[in-house]
Design a protein with these regions (language model features):
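Enzymes that bind and transform nitrogen-containing heteroaromatic metabolites
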Residues: 1-151
């Protein structure tokens, strides 16, 4: 979101940030379109509440965001279907919290080198997946994988 400079989304968006740092491109979003999930000890908590409104800032832990509570809080607001497009640290934390039920993964027919990190880094996780859908076109693979045992 931050790195790619996305504009204000049409659908509700939840920014998950221990620092409560709101990307500048989202600062002018209509009230209720952006929620912030953060922690009580965040230095940016007051600024996030000012920018988004008190009711749109979810404090879900003292120092770490309770991701299971985040998922249930969003479901209580009627947001049953949730899509996460975070980085590898957030993804690992979501896996460790047991709140991921599927993975959509695209593989293109190209090898590159460099210092890239894994898909999930940080929390140690070992999650069994089973394929639900695999499509191929021009060598590109589109996959939808379900977490075994997920709800």
């Amino acid at each position: 979101l931050r790195a790619e400079g996305y504009d204000v989304p049409r659908l509700p968006l939840v920014v998950v940030s221990r620092s409560a740092d709101l990307p500048p491109t989202l600062a002018g979003a209509p009230r209720g379109r952006i929620l912030m999930a953060t922690v009580a000890t965040s230095d940016g908590l007051a600024a996030a509440r000012e920018a988004l409104g008190e009711e749109n800032v979810l404090v879900l832990g003292e120092d770490e965001i309770d991701l299971a509570r985040l998922k249930s809080t969003l479901a209580e607001r009627g947001w049953e279907e949730q899509l996460c497009e975070g980085g590898p640290s957030l993804f690992a934390d979501l896996l460790a919290a047991g709140v991921v039920d599927e993975l959509c993964w695209t593989v293109v027919p190209r090898l590159t080198g460099g210092d890239a990190v894994r898909m999930a880094t940080g929390a140690e996780v070992d999650v069994a997946l089973r394929p639900a859908l695999l499509l191929e076109q021009d060598g590109t693979l589109l996959g939808r994988w379900l977490v075994q045992g997920a709800g």
